[in-house]
Amino acid sequence: MQYKKSLVASALVATSLAAYAPKDPWSTLTPSATYKGGITDYSSTFGIAVEPIATTASSKAKRAAAISQIGDGQIQATTKTTAAAVSQIGDGQIQATTKTKAAAVSQIGDGQIQATTKTTSAKTTAAAVSQIGDGQIQATTKTKAAAVSQIGDGQIQATTKTTAAAVSQIGDGQIQATTKTTAAAVSQIGDGQIQATTNTTVAPVSQITDGQIQATTLTSATIIPSPAPAPITNGTDPVTAETCKSSGTLEMNLKGGILTDGKGRIGSIVANRQFQFDGPPPQAGAIYAAGWSITPEGNLAIGDQDTFYQCLSGNFYNLYDEHIGTQCNAVHLQAIDLVNC
């Protein structure tokens, strides 16, 4: 019995030593492989739009909507076919709604990103993702993706319309987006999460205060005249889509393989495999905090993979780098230039 207890204790110690702690150097948290031809430095600020992989081929001529971020940094998006821009909320998380036409994603205070999930996710116009406060990224399930915004926690959310709406970010950094087919821009809420609606038309994604990213997923995205291509520091510019920048739109910078949002938070894959913005430094237990690139096709990649998964959580999606459940769909996170309209 004493021997068994010693083995268990040793295993626990080994696990704790392997986990990332905020005091450790986070810039070394990189995947072992890199994307062939990927660009690790991009001189311009850009957004992202959630594009369902199943509809990518048919939406090559369209622009996805930007993702917004909410305050928490999460990224979210609605589920509309038209992809809406993703916004970011305050916590930095990224989320998206489930509309077929993705609605624009905005960011709420926790940083999460949300967007609608509409089916019509148009790559040509791609709506910007916004960020909420928490930094998380989320999206609605509309076929036309709606724009993703960011709320206060940084989560990112966006609608899931097919026309990709811009993703916004809410305060927590999560990213969210609606699920409309037309992809809406993704916004970010305050927590940094990213969210998006599920509309098919992709709407631009926005960001709320928590860092989450949110965006609608409208499938049909509107086409914006493109200005002179943004300069890059290595390779050929792969970013061919653009969207109008608005308040709350998830704005990102890529330098040396490190991805940051407009609040300077670090884009990372956290312990539960979710994509969101935190810190610096990234949250304890983070798996990757570096190794980001833009692929020759114009998609965001971590290591050698450019496939992410939007997984339904209530009325929005969270973004992950792995398939974690039955309600998850494979998506690309299309990089889009943000322009003043």
Curated annotation (Swiss-Prot):
It comes from the Eukaryota. It is found in: Secreted, Cell wall. The gene is PIR1. Its main location: secreted. The PIR1/2/3 repeats are required for the covalent linkage to the cell wall. Their number varies among different strains of S.cerevisiae. Residues 1-18 form the signal peptide. This is Cell wall mannoprotein PIR1. The keyword Cell wall biogenesis/degradation applies. Residues 19-63 form a propeptide. GO terms for cellular component: extracellular region; fungal-type cell wall.
